[in-house]
Regions:
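Sec-dependent signal peptide recognition
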Residues: 2-9
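Non-catalytic accessory segments of hydrolases
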Residues: 19-168
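Surface-exposed acidic, glycine-flexible loop patches that form ligand/cofactor-binding
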Residues: 101-108, 183-191
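Alpha/beta-hydrolase active-site loop
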Residues: 94, 163-187
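Alpha/beta-hydrolase fold nucleophile elbow
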Residues: 111, 189-200
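Short, solvent-exposed turn/loop segments enriched in Gly/Ser/Thr/Pro and often Arg
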Residues: 145-147, 198-202
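Active-site loop->helix "elbow" adjoining a glycine-rich segment at hydrolase catalytic centers
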Residues: 118, 169-173, 201-202
Length: 202
């Protein structure tokens, strides 16, 4: 019995504590919870960083997320953006990002890596980031509009735009995601003043 108590005490003192991040996290738009990936990594998948770019918001600058009430469970990635080389679930409603963190609380100040996937602006989607989080960094992977949905410019679209221009919606999605990081990443234990952008191909 004494041996069992010793084993339990050793386990308790050597187990990572995620009391802070296991509770709902308050973002600008509302509260969320994530899921444990093991090895002390927490994942928050499918977080909206802009309103769905559909209907009147198609071929427009990304717009702020509409706030929600209650707590959303973020344990599944959002759909991939529309593309030709893909057999996964796709949708125009695709402006979601994912966060992997090994922080033990929101008071931590871990470096943040923002991954922008490749694919020549035409295909692919977000990657998994648990390996980065397991090595002391927070990884954010981002979806963005591609093909005609991300880059098409046309005089008629420019006339409808508040800024008088059209095109480059995919890059504007990148900027919206980075603004989201600046506003929210500290809630995941990240340092908003230590953010690195990286990627490949695109």
């Amino acid at each position: 019995m004494n041996n069992l108590r010793i084993i339990l005490l050793v386990f308790a003192f050597n187990s990572p504590v995620f009391a802070d991040l296991e509770q709902p996290i308050q973002l600008d738009a509302g509260q969320i919870t994530g899921t444990s990936m093991g090895s002390g990594v927490q994942a928050f998948l499918g977080i909206p960083f802009a309103s769905p770019p559909v209907g009147d918001l198609r071929w427009r600058e990304p717009q702020p997320v509409i706030p929600w009430s209650g707590v959303k469970v973020m344990d599944r990635k959002g759909p991939d953006c529309m593309q030709s080389r893909n057999t996964n679930l796709m949708s125009e409603d695709c402006l979601y990002l994912n966060v992997w963190t090994g922080a033990q609380s929101s008071a931590d100040k871990l470096p943040v890596l923002v991954w922008i996937h490749g694919g020549g602006w035409r295909f692919k989607a977000t990657y998994d980031g648990d390996a980065f989080a397991d090595n002391g960094a927070i990884l954010v992977s981002v979806n963005y509009r591609m093909n005609a949905f991300g880059w098409m410019a046309h005089p008629a679209l420019s006339e409808e735009s508040e800024n008088g221009v059209s095109g480059n919606y995919g890059v504007l999605d990148h900027l919206a995601a980075l603004e989201w990081v600046q506003s929210n990443i500290e809630q995941f234990g990240g340092d908003k003043d230590n953010v690195t952008i990286f990627g490949e191909s695109a």
